[in-house]
Every structure is written in C-alpha cells, then in structure tokens.
C-alpha cells in the first residue's frame, strides 16, 4: 500500500524534468492527479499528452480555486512558494510538497544528501564514483541528472543526491544518512529575502540526518544539532579528530584524514585549492557511509572534473584557457579565481558578467586585484561588476563572447590563464550555462 492515501486529489505544479518525474511516480501508483504550469507550452507538455492522455492539464495563469481543491500540491523547484495562488492554497490547508519529500518517504537505502552554493555537482559526482569503485549499487541524481523519484529501485544500496535550496523548501524531513551544506554564499537573492532566508532553506537538508559533514572554513555550513549526532569536517588546513584536510610535508601537500596522509594532491587530475576542498568533502561523505579508502582514493585519482567547472580547454601561445561557465554566482567565481590563481605561475585574465540575480559583486574586488591581470566584462550586469571592481585592475567592456575571448587573448601573457568564470547566470545572452561554455570553447579554438 502506498504511503500516500489515494482518496483525495493531487496537483503537480510545474511540468519540467522534476514535474514529469512526479507524473510518472503518481501514475505508477494509480493515484488521481492533475497537472498545471504557468507557461502556455511547458517543456514536457507533448510527452505528457502522448504518454498520459487521460491526465487533466491546465497551462497559463494558476487558478487558485482549482489549487485549493487539492489535498496536496507537488510544486516544482522552479516556482516560488510565494506565488499568490500557492499562498492561497496553503492558507486553505492544502499541503505543499515536492519530489524530494516523496522520495524521502519511499527510499529504503541510505541517502547521502549534498547541497551548497557551489561545488554540489562535483562533490555529488565524486561520491557516486567512489561508491561505484567500492562495488556499491548506487543511484546518483536529484538536482543533477536524473530526478530523484526516477532513481527509486529495490536493489539500490546507496542514494547520492544533489539538492538545491528550491528543492529543499518543499522537503519536510529528508532523514539522510549523512547530509552536508558544502558552503554558503550569496545566490538567488532575486528569490529570497536575504542571506538568512537562503541559509534557512539550505539547512533543511539536516532535518533527520544521522550524520553531518561541515566545512571548517565556513561557519554557515554548521547546523544546530544534538551533540549525539556524529559530525565530520573538511577544510584546507591541517586536520584534527574526525576531520579531513591538507598536510604539508617536504614541500608536498597531501589529502589527509586526522593525522594520516592519504594522497598527494599532485596525483589528482583536478587542480586548484577549491578542487582539493571538493575532494576532501567527498572523502568525508564517503567515509561517513563506510566506503573504503582504497576505493575512494582510486576514484579521486581517476576523476578529471565536470564540464564547465574550471575545465581546461586548451593552451595557446603559453596561455591556458579554462571554462568555468557553471560559476553562476559570486561565491563560485571566487573559488575559481582564488583556487586557479594560486595554482599558476602567471596571472588570470577573467571573463565575467551576465545576469547577476541581484548579487553584490564587491567581494570580487580583493581576489581580482590579487590574482588577475585584467577583467573582460560582458552581459546585462557588466556595469554593476565594473562599479564593484573600481580600479582594481584594467577593465574591458565587450558586447559578445567572441569579442571577449579575442580581447582576453590579447591581454594575456605567457604563463597566464584566461578564465571564464562569470559570477552570473547566463540567461541574458545564452540558453543556459552549458551553451555559454560551449561557445567559449569554440571561440578559443577559433583564435588565430
């Protein structure tokens, strides 16, 4: 028998990837439901009508009266819970839920739950690779790749989920085996009232967690939990008890656990301090669920990074080009600038700009002054970044990404690196951050 009673009506709100996974989940269980979407032609509409022609679909402005007729609304993460029709439904006593809440009710295997302003996808993928290396039947997804509900299966031994703050808003209690907030920096300020509001959403991941992993360098990642809950930590300093970190010996840095050296960072394919932090976070999470060190370290050595995350593109005339298009907020750009900037002999030429989502760019000024030779700006909020940077380094404004790459190539010197790390979303000029990254790589390849 399903955990959800089937005597009342449900509505799936939003017909993107997660919405379609909800449709499949409810249909498999024979539960009555309808689908609504604020868009006239949502991305999965044709698929829904072809596979589930019996399901009622309403597109366009949300009908509050219709939503109030349901016992439960499954809201997709792309829609704010402050949407007036949703607020009215909640006030009438309609339960507001989502795909992660349903997943948590059904999952039988332990869950590794990962959120954070940055590095979620890299750490999630790493933990998944570590589990595979340990011969675990693992399912990896959530905000990354496969929607969580599509992962559910009886033979799975471990779930590894990347979760966004939007997904966590509709999850009452995840009950993860181990949960982490990797880092917290300003993001999505166009949707939240401020950092405190955003921080609260992120920390919903810890509800019911049996173990937690925290970032020693970021106090905002540490939850208010009972002393009886095991707490592991990671950071770039020397580790102590129940901690992962870096040990330096004879001029060589090692990934380490407590007082034991594990692996020289020189054996990693991923570069930069931010990636060493990602590796340590993955080790902490894997260790918490019992993955053996030999399997985890083997997976780490084989991992070459994800596309558009500080990804090496090519070297030209002694200058390396890196695609960090996934850096859609200030915190991600800071991690790339500081991590890569400290790891090269020369300076960075930074390409930045786009849709800033209401962010404050002033935190970029100091690391840009320290690590960058120049900054090339483009996109809607280029002017805001220019104001924040002031006269820290030379600034160049351009209209297109092709022009940005050409200007960066002229500014860079041998030993430098050109880094696309926009600190902004891409939707003002591109379909998504992936397209921005692909077009950057294409422009780099086309340099004379």
Curated annotation (Swiss-Prot):
Entry's Gene Ontology molecular function annotations: ATP binding; UDP-N-acetylmuramoylalanine-D-glutamate ligase activity
Any single GO BP term: peptidoglycan biosynthetic process
EC number of the protein: 6.3.2.9
InterPro entries linked: Mur-like_cat_sf (IPR036565), Mur_ligase_C (IPR004101), Mur_ligase_C_dom_sf (IPR036615), Mur_ligase_cen (IPR013221), MurD (IPR005762)
Positions bound to UDP-N-acetyl-alpha-D-muramoyl-L-alanine: 17-18, 38-39, 78, 143, 188
Reactions performed catalytically: UDP-N-acetyl-alpha-D-muramoyl-L-alanine + D-glutamate + ATP = UDP-N-acetyl-alpha-D-muramoyl-L-alanyl-D-glutamate + ADP + phosphate + H(+)
Similarity section: Belongs to the MurCDEF family.
Associated pathway: Cell wall biogenesis; peptidoglycan biosynthesis
PANTHER family: UDP-N-ACETYLMURAMOYLALANINE--D-GLUTAMATE LIGASE
List of residues binding ATP: 116-122
UniProt protein name: UDP-N-acetylmuramoylalanine--D-glutamate ligase
Keywords: ATP-binding, Cell cycle, Cell division, Cell shape, Cell wall biogenesis/degradation, Cytoplasm, Ligase, Nucleotide-binding, Peptidoglycan synthesis
HAMAP family listed in its UniProt record: MurD (MF_00639)
Entry function: Involved in cell wall formation. Catalyzes the addition of D-glutamate to the peptidoglycan precursor UDP-N-acetylmuramoyl-L-alanine (UMA).
GO CC entries: cytoplasm
Binding site for ADP: 119-122, 278, 309, 324, 326
Location in the cell: Cytoplasm
């Amino acid at each position: 028998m399903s955990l959800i009673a089937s005597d009342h009506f449900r509505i799936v709100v939003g017909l993107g990837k997660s919405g379609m996974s909800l449709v499949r989940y409810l249909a498999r269980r024979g539960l009555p439901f309808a689908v609504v979407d604020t868009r006239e032609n949502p991305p999965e509409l044709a698929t829904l009508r072809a596979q589930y022609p019996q399901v009622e679909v309403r597109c366009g402005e949300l009908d509050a009266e219709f939503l109030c007729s349901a016992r439960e609304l499954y809201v997709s993460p792309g829609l704010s819970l402050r949407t007036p029709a949703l607020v009215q439904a909640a006030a009438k006593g309609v339960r507001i839920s989502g795909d992660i809440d349903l997943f948590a009710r059904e999952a039988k295997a332990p869950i590794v739950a990962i959120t954070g302003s940055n590095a979620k996808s890299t750490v999630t993928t790493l933990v998944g690779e570590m589990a595979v290396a340990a011969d675990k039947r693992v399912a990896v997804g959530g905000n990354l790749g496969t929607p969580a509900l599509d992962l559910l299966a009886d033979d799975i031994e471990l779930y590894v989920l990347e979760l966004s703050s939007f997904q966590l808003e509709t999850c009452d209690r995840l009950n993860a085996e181990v949960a982490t907030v990797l880092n917290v920096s300003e993001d999505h300020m166009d949707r939240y009232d401020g950092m405190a509001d955003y921080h609260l959403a992120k920390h919903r991941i810890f509800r019911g967690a049996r173990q937690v992993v925290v970032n020693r360098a970021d106090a905002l990642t540490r939850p208010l939990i009972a002393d009886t809950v095991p707490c592991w930590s990671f950071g770039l300093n020397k580790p102590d008890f129940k901690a992962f970190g870096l040990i330096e010996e004879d001029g060589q840095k090692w990934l380490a656990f407590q007082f034991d050296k594990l692996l020289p960072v020189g054996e990693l394919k991923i570069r930069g301090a931010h990636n060493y932090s990602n590796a340590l976070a993955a080790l902490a999470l894997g260790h918490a669920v019992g993955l053996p060190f030999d399997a985890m370290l083997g997976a780490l050595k084989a991992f070459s990074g994800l596309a558009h995350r500080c990804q090496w593109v090519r070297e030209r005339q002694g200058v390396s080009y890196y695609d960090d298009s996934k850096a859609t907020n200030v915190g991600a750009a800071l991690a790339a600038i500081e991590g890569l900037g400290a790891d090269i002999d020369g300076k960075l030429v930074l390409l930045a700009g786009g849709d800033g989502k209401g962010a404050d760019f002033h935190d970029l000024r100091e690391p840009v002054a320290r690590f960058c030779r120049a900054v090339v700006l483009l996109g809607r909020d280029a002017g805001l970044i220019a104001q924040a940077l002031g006269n820290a380094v030379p600034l160049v404004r351009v209209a297109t990404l092709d022009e940005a790459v050409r200007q960066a190539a002229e500014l860079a010197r041998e030993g430098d690196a050109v880094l696309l790390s926009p600190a902004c979303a891409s939707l003002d000029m591109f379909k998504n951050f992936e397209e921005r990254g692909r077009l950057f790589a294409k422009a780099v390849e086309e340099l004379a």
